[in-house]
Amino acid sequence: MEFLLGNPFSTPVGQCLEKATDGSLQSEDWTLNMEICDIINETEEGPKDAIRALKKRLSGNRNYREVMLALTVLETCVKNCGHRFHLLVANRDFIDSVLVKIISPKNNPPTIVQDKVLALIQAWADAFRSSPDLTGVVHIYEELKRRGIEFPMADLDALSPIHTPQRSVPEMDPAATIPRSQTQPRTTAGTYSSPPPASYSTLQAPALSVTGPITANSEQIARLRSELDIVRGNTKVMSEMLTEMVPGQEDSSDLELLQELNRTCRAMQHRIVELISRVSNEEVTEELLHVNDDLNNVFLRYERFERYRSGRSVQNASNGVLSEVTEDNLIDLGPGSPAVVSPMVGSTAPPSSLSSQLAGLDLGTESVSGTLSSLQQCKPQDGFDMFAQTRGNSLAEQRKTVTYEDPQAVGGLASALDNRKQNSEMIPVAQPSVMDDIEVWLRTDLKGDDLEEGVTSEEFDKFLEERAKAAETVPDLPSPPTEAPAPASNTSTRKKPERSDDALFAL
């Protein structure tokens, strides 16, 4: 395509744009920028040549100094050129293939470049929303918002309007206009002295009550420039601090200094805006406009920093509350833990010991529920303390401290069991369990009976009859088996202690 159309920088507007976006420039050359706007407005091919040159400079360029200068030229041309240039800029193809690609993650541009591109797309979408033939940028803007792209906050009062007001001088026919490069040699930036068009001065001047122009002498201009250097220094320091500081992790002294710089720079901007509309010196006005743009950019970055910082503080506060509740709910068995100390605070009477409760048990009851009902009500933590106390004494020690004169005066679980065994004057015999009866029943008449897989209905009926006969020979489950070696005379005297022991062990 470049072979067919030629080098984009070979045209008159392309040559000016190449010089205005040279990376060796220390700052924007507003003289060249305004000359580019004049060529676009006065020539037939000016808008197309300018778009081609801007695409060449912006596409795939990793020199972000040149990219920033090209974006400034593009913004200036949109503000000072007419509908022919707006049609090419607001085109969906130009926005998507040039500007959106600059901020793609694979290019990883600096934050200042991302903010500049997003601010341009947002401003153009707001300005061209009501124009049916300029809605390409509006569609791109809506798509980026749906994808979660966060646009910088724009101070609409401080920004210049996009649509250029009507010229005070009638616009000449572009076809009848002879390019300036053909009639006279192009002068350099240092000797260029033609004033900018009326539209530029009208756009940049805010709607303030102007009492009259100020004609400053050389001494006043020198003093004003020294003050502007101070403003630039404050702006640079503020920008570097915003680059280094992380929202939510900043130092208190750095944050206080940043807020003080913000207040100072805003007061300075108010004075600069007043001077822009009143100073008649063109060079001073350009410097004031440049400083004002720098202030607006750093203010946008500061507002974004404050939003991130406030969001982080709210998130940290919610996380702090959650962690505090979680720590209170955890079980801590340390010496100073509230979970261990708090249940003992305010206790008026010591809990009854396990020995005293076991001494009051009615061991003559026939059921476990009756034995359990004789226990006193106690709290779970009291039962834990009593269990810990009983673990401290061995079985032998408890037997030494027990007197067997009164069965109700026993001092522990082991003593109560020993006392009951001595009173019964018999050694308890193990009670056969229900599982033993079931095993005997299963072994009855089934030792040699192996079932095969293929069983007829007659064999199955026979098997059921054998099972029924075996079930009739099995004794009832509650009664002990007949082969138990227990004398019949001692059955009645042995039954009661055995059930009492079972009830006690069930506890």
Curated annotation (Swiss-Prot):
Q: A Gene Ontology biological process annotation? A: signal transduction
**What keywords would UniProt list here?**
Phosphoprotein, Protein transport, Transport
Species whose genome carries this gene: Mus musculus (Mouse)
* Subunit organization: Interacts with clathrin, SRC and TOLLIP. Interacts with MYO6.
The record's annotation in Pfam families points to: GAT, VHS
Q: Name one GO molecular function term.
A: clathrin binding
Q: Where is this motif: Clathrin-binding?
A: 329-334
Quote the SUPFAM superfamilies the UniProt record gives: ENTH/VHS domain, GAT-like domain
**Recorded family membership:** Belongs to the TOM1 family.
Q: Give residue ranges for domain GAT.
A: 219-307
Source domain of life is Eukaryota
Q: Where is the VHS domain?
A: 20-152
Region named Disordered? 164-200, 466-507
Q: In which tissues is it expressed?
A: Ubiquitously expressed. Splicing pattern displays tissue specific variation.
Instruction: Name the chain's protein.
Output: TOM1-like protein 2
Q: Give the function comment from the record.
A: Acts as a MYO6/Myosin VI adapter protein that targets myosin VI to endocytic structures. May also play a role in recruiting clathrin to endosomes. May regulate growth factor-induced mitogenic signaling.
Q: Which residues carry this modification: Phosphothreonine?
A: 164
Q: Which residues carry this modification: Phosphoserine?
A: 160
Phosphoprotein: is it a keyword of this entry? yes
Q: What is known of its domains?
A: The GAT domain mediates interaction with TOLLIP.
